[in-house]
């Protein structure tokens, strides 16, 4: 393998990792995999899938605090936790301003059964609203792991879920030039 000819900093005089292209190609690969799997959209809750499709990092301390609705033929919608939403909007300018939403979460049942059911109902209503707005309500929708409260609320709202994990694994299986260069850079740093 050739030596890595660039470092971690960004410069205007060398072709290095192109992060705009990285984000664009990752989303395109995901959308192609969703289409191939016959999915109109996917509700993604797993950190690695949100990161892959939106390039967003966030809190990792509890499941389903945030989620992304990634469409096969439209731009993704990001549902973000509380005040984190405002900070993400400032820095993640590649997500369209109209595609940010506040997330609904129920913290694995900590608030109690009635609160969980109500929050899951609001979650499902928000998802259904966006599915209808994009013309895919009633089509096959994938997920990479929504808990029972979320699944039940979506089913009650008429959303039938199937696994999006095969499509996500397919999308991530073949690396782009920028993904390979990210891996090479990480290896170069760790081999010092």
Q: How should these model regions be labeled?
A:
Residues 192:
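N-terminal glycine-rich flavin-associated loop
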Residues 1-189:
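A composition/biophysics-driven feature that prefers long, compositionally simple stretches
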């Amino acid at each position: 393998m050739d030596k890595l000819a660039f470092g971690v900093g960004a410069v205007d005089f060398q072709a290095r990792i192109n992060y705009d292209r990285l984000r664009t190609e990752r989303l395109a690969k995901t959308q192609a995999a969703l289409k191939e799997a016959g999915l109109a959209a996917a509700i993604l809750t797993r950190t690695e899938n949100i990161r892959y499709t939106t390039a967003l990092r966030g809190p990792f301390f509890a499941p389903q605090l945030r989620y992304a609705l990634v469409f096969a033929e439209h731009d993704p919608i990001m549902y973000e936790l509380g005040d984190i939403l405002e900070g993400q909007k400032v820095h993640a300018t590649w997500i369209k301003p109209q595609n940010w939403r506040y997330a609904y979460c129920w913290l694995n049942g900590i608030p109690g059964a009635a609160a969980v059911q109500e929050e899951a109902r609001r979650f499902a209503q928000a998802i259904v609203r966006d599915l209808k707005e994009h013309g895919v309500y009633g089509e096959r929708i994938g997920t990479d792991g929504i808990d029972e409260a979320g699944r039940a609320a979506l089913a009650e709202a008429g959303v039938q879920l199937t696994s999006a994990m095969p499509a996500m694994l397919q999308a991530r299986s073949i690396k782009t030039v920028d993904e390979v260069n990210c891996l090479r850079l990480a290896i170069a740093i760790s081999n010092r």
